[in-house]
């Protein structure tokens, strides 16, 4: 058993690893783990909600090619715009727009044959035909991701696993987590928003909408 005396002790090992260290630091004085007299260490665990949608944008076909590495994600960012609106979920989310002519995977996320099959065009080819298809679709896909705030609930928590240890023999965490209806409704709102934006860009949505089942 070790002890340290200091005016302030800061443990910054990330959310879950910090809880793991504290919960594993049991002693006669701290039977519940260090700093856990409230029995709340590891509780109210929460993460971002997230959803994504992609679309093929015909107006972006056959455009002049140049390097777009680094454009997308947090570089094209829309903060929450519906503050104080009446919605069926609390909090909000932001949008991250991505796509463009970047490496790898041709810059559009799928190989040209998958696009040709999706649009009912001739599949296959090599040489000049394949090169033309790659250039035609290159940079023509746009995706939108949403990242939102979930509600912290006491029922979502991590605790020390009584049966599993890491390679050093130190007990690991096990997790108890479930989404509430608020997060599910937020994800539905995300997808509705993404589809509205992409369809107003004359985009053709790719793949099935998440959560249809």
Where are these regions (language model features)?
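Short helix-capping/linker segments at secondary-structure and domain boundaries
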Residues: 28-30, 152-154, 201-205
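A broad structural signal for short, well-ordered beta-strand segments within beta-sheet-rich domains
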Residues: 1, 141, 154, 202-203, ...
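FAD cofactor-binding and catalytic pocket of flavoenzymes
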Residues: 38-173, 181
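Glycine-rich loop(s) and the adjacent beta-strand/alpha-helix scaffold that form part
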Residues: 1-69
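Mobile, glycine/GP-rich and aromatic-enriched active-site lid/loop segments adjacent to catalytic centers
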Residues: 118-124, 174-176, 180-213
